[in-house]
Amino acid sequence: MEEEARPAAGAGEAATPARETPPAAPAQARAASGGVPESAPEPKRRQLGTLLQPTVNKFSLRVFGSHKAVEIEQERVKSAGAWIIHPYSDFRFYWDLIMLLLMVGNLIVLPVGITFFKEENSPPWIVFNVLSDTFFLLDLVLNFRTGIVVEEGAEILLAPRAIRTRYLRTWFLVDLISSIPVDYIFLVVELEPRLDAEVYKTARALRIVRFTKILSLLRLLRLSRLIRYIHQWEEIFHMTYDLASAVVRIFNLIGMMLLLCHWDGCLQFLVPMLQDFPSDCWVSMNRMVNHSWGRQYSHALFKAMSHMLCIGYGQQAPVGMPDVWLTMLSMIVGATCYAMFIGHATALIQSLDSSRRQYQEKYKQVEQYMSFHKLPADTRQRIHEYYEHRYQGKMFDEESILGELSEPLREEIINFTCRGLVAHMPLFAHADPSFVTAVLTKLRFEVFQPGDLVVREGSVGRKMYFIQHGLLSVLARGARDTRLTDGSYFGEICLLTRGRRTASVRADTYCRLYSLSVDHFNAVLEEFPMMRRAFETVAMDRLRRIGKKNSILQRKRSEPSPGSSGGVMEQHLVQHDRDMARGVRGLAPGTGARLSGKPVLWEPLVHAPLQAAAVTSNVAIALTHQRGPLPLSPDSPATLLARSARRSAGSPASPLVPVRAGPLLARGPWASTSRLPAPPARTLHASLSRTGRSQVSLLGPPPGGGARRLGPRGRPLSASQPSLPQRATGDGSPRRKGSGSERLPPSGLLAKPPGTVQPPRSSVPEPVTPRGPQISANM
């Protein structure tokens, strides 16, 4: 104690002994104990001092801003004087909670007791009134020692003189009138049995003064200590702030309406009772003067609610003037409360789900926009589906929200929302966390529908994409298509080479992607050169797999590597990229995929555009290498190609065919443009799946069949000879039992029995003897 008081005396008194401490030492000692008198024991002094001071918690930190500010406020309480209570202390919080419950009880019980009970000297009634009067008087005394929050200046008055002056000017008179101990007076003087009727009515009038305690309740609702109590209950029930505040507002509104109905019902009976129930009042007309108080209260409450809700007058219309004025007053109060209730309820409902309301308003504008431009029904449906998948019924201004946050908090939110992308992407799993954060903070969320071309071959690349969910196809000219799924990325090649797109990427399902612009891409890679080398390695491997090269990437790869750890990471990324390409290759190609809004009928023909002459020669070679009549229907893709070739026969420069040939048609051994070599011991099968798609595959030769050569009259076909043979005849070898050609699919691509199919004809009159592989339709 003395050591704490010595530094406060000043630098010149640092050497003063403890017995020569200045007279201010007792005050300093009292301040050190939290403003509690020194006569109290040391442990109790410290406990009481802690209860009277603000504690460090979420609410105090939100009010004062920091731990240091809370400590300064505690020092202010210690130096303010003895028994000064801080308004944000624990003691004041619990005291206000007790007073709040007691006030609510008085606001409900006192009107009923004053109105419907004549004998008020029963023990329960006396105990309740005495207890209430005691707490109200104690609250009146404590208000002189409790700090006052000045809302205008955002400060707290703790000086005793300032507290006293301000309290006397504001709420002292109301609290004094509402705290008059009428029951104490009746008990001590014992005047209640000898009071005549006039004095008894006067005593009842004094009890009505207790209604002014509603002003104290309103004052408590305005103070932040009640809000602090609500916040603590939020943390207990693990509620969000919006939900908890909305629920509390609903209960407050409903409770206020019921309390006003309760008061109005008591007032409807109190006025006739003070007039000794005249003959024209509603109580006398209904003969309820001597009924029980429960029945009287029920009829009075029904009459009051009928007036307040403006649905009638109750059991009968008012007759006397007091009843008429009470009815008008009830209607005015009820209409006001009803309007307030509707307004608050509407605002509350709108605030509960503002994001969904914004989405609905936005979509109404979109519907009006589509109607104004008279968009077709298919386009409207695609727009509707896009909004459903993009926003999912809620709309936020995410850029504005994230822009208002601090950088660490923004990075934390982005890392949390993109945690699924990071978990499924090896590029981020093996990368520096700083690189991952730098990339994630610059990503932009996008949604694509089935059939959308995310990337178009030959266009200038300005973005690269990371796949969060969805399935996409990479369509490269003259190469097998590659499929990408969750955790993959694409579009980085043109950003690295500053060139054009080397392939097209089409969305097969609804895809949720994150895009990275070229400026952000280069800015991130400048900070992390190791990751640039990893991107270049994967890009070169992808180009190598589709049979393309890039001199810029090769030149960059020839430069020495800055470290050995990067090579290991590059190997992991390349291996995972290859494994993923092989893993998704077996997926069903028709999983919701659409091309320009139409289903793909024969997918191997929609990959790389070829010249019509080349396609004609390929089909012609396939037809000449069959061993029997072609078991394909006239509507099959091969027959359609043959017809298209016959129409364009003789043209020196045929246009591009609007379909794409599969990789095996484009690169098979029959696609030679100079001379047809002797085919190996393999058989060409054109199989038609259940969905109507045709696939060409190389299988082994059938039992007993071997490779054959062209006859003496046969000649090789090339792209410069766009003619088909007139007739194709086989060796008549029987088909294997149980082959796919014996089962007819329901898709309409039916193979007619041998001998009924007319051989395809051409402008060339001479027949060609078939030699080589056999083509059959497996259905």
UniProtKB/Swiss-Prot annotation:
Glycosylated position list: 290
SMART domains in alphabetical order: cNMP
GO molecular function, one term: voltage-gated sodium channel activity
Primary localization class, coarse: membrane
Compositional bias segments (type: Polar residues): 687-697
Function: Hyperpolarization-activated ion channel that are permeable to sodium and potassium ions, with an about 3:1 preference for potassium ions. Contributes to the native pacemaker currents in heart (If) and in neurons (Ih). In particular, plays a pivotal role in maintaining excitability and promoting rhythmic burst firing within hypothalamic nuclei. Exerts a significant influence on the configuration of the cardiac action potential waveform. Does not appear to play a prominent role in the processing of acute, neuropathic, or inflammatory pain.
Domain notes: The segment S4 is the voltage-sensor and is characterized by a series of positively charged amino acids at every third position. The ion-conducting pore region is between segment S5 and S6.
Family according to the record: Belongs to the potassium channel HCN family.
Protein name: Potassium/sodium hyperpolarization-activated cyclic nucleotide-gated channel 3
Species this chain originates from: Mus musculus
Lineage: Eukaryota, Metazoa, Chordata, Craniata, Vertebrata
Record gene name: Hcn3
